[in-house]
Amino acid sequence: MSKGRLLVIEGLDGSGKATQAKLLASYLAESGRKVMEITFPDYESDSSALVKMYLSGQFGDKPDDVNPYAASSFYAVDRYASYKTKWGSFYEAGGIVIADRYTTSNAVHQCSKLPPEQWDDFLRWAFDYEYRLLGLPAPDAVVYLQVDPAVSQKLMTGRYHGDESRKDVHEKDIEYLARSRRAAEYCAEHLGWSTVHCTENGAMRTIEDIQAEVRALAEKELG
């Protein structure tokens, strides 16, 4: 039996990844396809312990306090454990997996800790580590949900009802988020991701409009 397909929904915080991934998985299931939705980090698993320590500031108050290679390893191990225990067999048996974040998040959030001239080397290392050395499957397609930074910040503030203390070390650092957006734009352009522009005239497009575009991209990939 041929292996399955892996479609990734990527984007910065506040871009609506979880909503769009869930809607896409439901749509594909309703069309008769064998589909599973996964989310990273896998906070329900013990494998995310180092990720939680990192994001809660136990290794430093700023994202840059943890170098990108160490931080990437935290997330990679979490993905490996998830693959081995939750979705690997399903994927290997031909199922369609919809991922809310994946290896692509390391590309976005950890590249941003480095000067741009080092991005290509880091990306080669990150993907070689996860796909070749760890044996995780590479995605068949990545959909990048692009959101204007001001809109993203407003959405995140609303998520926590104005309580800034609930934000993790990434979400609290505006300058870091700006760098991550630049890294995301670079990755989308150079790694062949499909970009969905989620904001229009300073506001989010409707969930339904965005989902229609996401579905069209998924159908094009799945055939």
Please state what every model-predicted region is.
Residues S2-L6:
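Pre-Walker A (Motif I) flank of P-loop NTPase domains
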Residues K17:
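Conserved lysine of the Walker
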Residues Q20:
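Hydrophobic positions on the alpha1 helix immediately C-terminal to the Walker A/P-loop
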Residues T104-R182:
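A glycine- and Lys/Arg-enriched "phosphate-lid" helix/loop adjacent to the NTP-binding pocket
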Residues S31-D128, R132-L134:
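ATP-dependent small-molecule kinase phosphotransfer cores
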Residues A25, A150-G223:
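NTP-dependent small-molecule kinase module
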Residues I9:
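Hydrophobic anchor at the beta1->P-loop junction of P-loop NTPases
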Residues L12:
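P-loop (Walker A) phosphate-binding loop of NTP-binding proteins
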